[in-house]
Amino acid sequence: MAEERIQKIMVLFEQPENESRLERLTGKLMQVRDIRGTIGRMAMEQVLDDLELFELKTFALCSEEIRGLVEEWRIVLLPELEPVVRLLDPEGNRIPHFYIYDTYSAELARLRAEIKQKSLQGAEERELEALYVQSVVLEDKVREELSVQLRPYHDDLKQALEAVGLLDVVLAKARQAIRGQLTLPQIPEEGEMVFEGLFHPQIREILEQEGRAFQAVDLKLEKGTTVITGANMAGKTVLLKSVQLAQYL
């Protein structure tokens, strides 16, 4: 299945009309952070703090953009996280920022406005502190309510994070395969093993940096013992390393 995804992406890379979308996709994948810890706290039904709510909002926004970019390609299945976005972005700004917005609580909005007004009027510190404590209690209540409202989306968030991680890996492998002129091997269950244009990627890269070329090798290995002969420094060790690396990969 992973091989099919890689091949599909390699085909997409070869089509010029996909270049802009693939660049945007790469940029979005670079913005994704590992939020497994936050998702784990959701599973334990804990109250999330502002940083964790920010992580969920940022990931949900990013995942939705990625879903829009790859949905028609059918490379990975990304669940819809728009309900998560609506919970954490009540004002609909769709920016990677989180705050206990006034929209969450009319009482909190009133308290904040009162604190601001009394501060401008030079109210006593004790009075302002009392109002501030009330606002903190209301903010904690909002966090608790949000944490409860987000719990039904735990599985979707977990699935989306795994799918985005898989997409990142197969995209990188496809890009590496194209740049390195790599092919998907056909592995026989028995019989001879054939390598065409075999090379060692690291050694080839070093030679190219020095303005030299790597001599690719065609090789057929049959069941039994194979003896490699040749002059000193003729490439026997490099050939063995290339075969070993190809076999390992």
Predicted feature descriptions by range:
Residues E162-A234, Q247-L249:
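Conserved NTPase motor "head" modules and their coupling/switch loops across ABC/AAA+ ATPases, GTPases
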Residues N18, L146-R151, T226-G230:
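Glycine- and acidic
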